[in-house]
Every structure is written in C-alpha cells, then in structure tokens.
Curated annotation (Swiss-Prot):
Organism: Bacillus subtilis (strain 168)
A GO cellular-component term linked to this record: plasma membrane
Keywords: Cell membrane, Membrane
Induction: Only expressed during growth in minimal medium.
Superkingdom in the source lineage: Bacteria
Keyword match Cell membrane: yes
Protein name (database record): Protein YwpG
GN (gene name): ywpG
Length: 127
C-alpha cells in the first residue's frame, strides 16, 4: 500500500508559506502527527495529503463559520490531477489518519476533534 503524508496546510485558500504571519509565532508545528495551526473562528482551512509517489492527492477542507467538513480525492492522469468519485469517503484510510492526528488552534487554546461526523472544539480553559 502506498504511504501518504501531509503535504501542505492552506488557510483561506492560501498556501502556508504565502500566508502573512509574525516571525516569532510558530505557524505549523509538526511532531509525531501533532500539528499546531494559528486560525481564528472565521477561518477556513484545507489539509492537502499526497501519496509518496505523487500519484494521488487528498484534500480535507474544514470551514469554521459553516461548521462543514468536506473531502476531495485527486488522481494524476499523466498531465494533471483529475477529481475522482468520493463516495464513502468516511471509510477511506486517509480520513482515519486525519482523525487520528491532533490539531491545536491558537487563540483560546482550543483542540479540534471530530465526533459523530461534526466538527467540535473544546476550550482547554473550561475543562
């Protein structure tokens, strides 16, 4: 089976290296599948995963204002990436990896987790 990795995190459709941030603040921290992302409540974020051979890409989009989570699958056809059918995406291995990873959102020190198919955040200050 082909391995995949988190290639990029996009905020509001802009790649992280293009996103204007303060130099003192860590934008994305990766250590053993733990990612720290600085995002406000109005933000939209996309996680782009890619297989090791570069033949497939998976995009998981999270919209905080709409409280929506969506999934897109792309396959390389020799000249470009083509969007594939994404039925039953909740059972795909990439989605399980996304769920197993931990994402911390700065601001109110919220940790994002998914439960019952909906995005939830837990305020660490409230317990």
């Amino acid at each position: 089976m082909n391995q995949f990795r988190l290639k990029e995190i996009y905020i509001d459709g802009v790649p992280s290296e293009s996103h204007l941030i303060q130099k003192e603040v860590t934008y994305m921290l990766s250590r053993k599948e733990v990612f720290e992302v600085h995002l406000n409540k109005k933000g939209r974020i996309s996680f782009l995963y890619e297989t090791q051979d570069g033949m497939e890409q998976y995009k998981i989009k999270l919209s905080m204002p709409e409280k929506k989570l969506s999934f897109q699958w792309f396959a390389w056809d020799g000249s470009s990436y083509v969007r594939m059918n994404t039925q039953n995406w909740l059972t795909k291995q990439i989605f399980f990896r996304f769920l197993k990873s931990t994402y911390f959102f700065k601001g109110k020190k919220q940790k994002m987790f998914l439960a019952e198919g909906k995005m939830k955040t837990k305020d660490k200050n409230r317990g």
